[in-house]
Amino acid sequence: MKDWERVLGLDLAGSPKRKTGYAFLKDKRLVVGTLYTDEEILEISKGFKLIMIDAPLSLPEGRRSIEERGPHFRECDRLLKKSGYRFFPISLGPMRMLTERGMRLASILRSKGLEVLETFPGAMYDLLGIDRRDKNAILSLYKSLPFELEDRPYSQDELDAVACWLAGVCYLMGKVLTFSGKDGKIVVATGECFSSPPLDKE
């Protein structure tokens, strides 16, 4: 479980004017909150080894930049879609900013020797049969896990950040679905992960 304290989950916003959720484990307690700027994100990332980000971290093969015309979907996106999971393509308005920011931050973090992976909370919720916007159901899942979580209202950004963190934990446990292609990889926590020790709270 000590390794889990080296995982940081980020529900990245496309703009530094909007909230980015973060989540990590410290002394068996989930620390959850929001921040805004790239500088704040890079600062909080210090001391972690695995960063899980809810944002596209690569471009489709054949697309040279987010501004130029090109393919809308990566191979990993097509695999995700084939499995029945809904998502927004990187070419959609707000997703352009998110993709650009995600790629930039991932590049900086990787240059510092950190492992950075893309994840998608929406797919995790779908796998577990939870409505993506049902905060009460999502929070109920988190409270069933063997970690302390402050009893307070949580924003969707914060809840999704916890989902990102959990994807990192499940990745370390080897219990994830990996949608991998030549132009990107998306890691999603599986239901099996939540029914396996030590996540299966007794």
Positions of PLM-derived features:
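Phosphate- and other anionic-substrate recognition elements at nucleic-acid/protein interfaces
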Residues: 1-202
